[in-house]
Amino acid sequence: MSTQICRRFVIDGIRDTMDHYRAGALPLHRLSWELHSRIDTLVPHAPAVWIDQLRDLHRRIAEVHERGERTPFGELDRRELDDSLRLLRVALEHNRG
């Protein structure tokens, strides 16, 4: 499979994963795991700077999940999660290739 085809396939998978989360069909811990796995899959197919950006956004999502495991999920957490998902979608669109 070519790098460009693989990259598009993985990006579509990330987008689908976010859509499933937003629709309530995927819990936050699974969203975090899926994002981590799919971003790792992109490593040989994408520039390191972009991978670092995606990983940073994933870390923000994972941190919200970890805080939610310890304390009730608050409005600030929800806003941070929404912002991270929005930025992740923008990053995917700009680097679709």
Task: For each feature predicted by the language model, list its residue ranges.
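Acidic, Ser/Pro/Thr-rich low-complexity regulatory regions
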Residues: 1-97
